[in-house]
Amino acid sequence: MNVRPSFAIAAAALAACAAPQAVDNTPENPTAVLETVVTNGGIAGMFAFEVTEKRWVRPNMRREEHTLKGTGTFSRYLVNAVAGGGDASITRLDEDKLWGLHLRKKEYTECPAHGCPVPPAAEKEEKQREDEQAKEEPKQQTEPNCTTHVTSSNFNVNPTGEKKSINGFDASQYTAAWVLKLADTKKRVTTSTVSFDIWTTPLAQPMRDAFAVEQQFMKSYGARARPGPDRTQPMPAEVTRMMSGYLSSLRPQDRAQLQNAGKQLSKIQGHPVYTHIEWHLEGDACGDKGPEKKEQSSSPTSVQGMLGSMAGSLFKKDEKPAGPPPILSFTVEVKQLGVQPVKDSVFAVPAGFKKVN
């Protein structure tokens, strides 16, 4: 029995019956396009993920799109199941509209360009959610009521002379190391080392043009514009936030040194197109035993608890790198940065999306 030709005929028939793909006849206009991929290894490897951030910008409109996926065995399942598919927002100053798109569900919300009013109850709920999330992040396992302070802080930045092309950008390499010495009242010491592998490119005219368009949009948007992550900095704000959150024993007055770390990288010339950061800790200040492990009950009361109890064995089996792993790894890579023709349809709600507010 010749089954394969029958399948081929059936497939051809289905293809013939399928609705033809809509042709996009909207005009093309110059648009700033900025695309960045951020790979976050997570604190101690927990819940590693990758997010693609893309912006299309004109003087009176902007589309921002985020696609999130887990990169570890466990986080791949969790992130893709809960937040997979990505989301986007379209701001149209010419129409005073803000559309929020859920790309997987094909749904959207509509608000004025500066956003819908947020009820006080919703603000309180969001704050509680952020606080709960902060509690779940891994932290140092240290002695109770023990504090550490910074005894020395040293930066070393070096151009290596190495050059290569990264996503079409002619890039030059810098390496840097930031070494912090932390001590407790018993004179026990921990050494914190943040290493940087940074590739930069001269700020060429296409890049300047893209930034100029974005600045023009922000000026038109007004003071209420909420800035996104600044990917022009070699030291991303997320890294210092995660470091500060993990170092639970560090005195509050010393945390400012973490927040100001990026200023020490001012010797680096050019625009970063690739940055890889690793953070290592070594020592026993405050009896440091590494990341705090969240205990799970034998009968989890939530999906999060059940998934969390599964995470440990999955990570140990499939995600533990050879050698001492870093507490944190973080990579930022620029994929696109310039002005190019883009269809007007990018700034409209796609056909078939359902309004849900």
Q: What are these language model-derived features?
A:
Residues 23-357:
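Extended soluble regions of mature proteins
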Residues 1-8:
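Bacterial N-terminal signal peptides that target proteins for export
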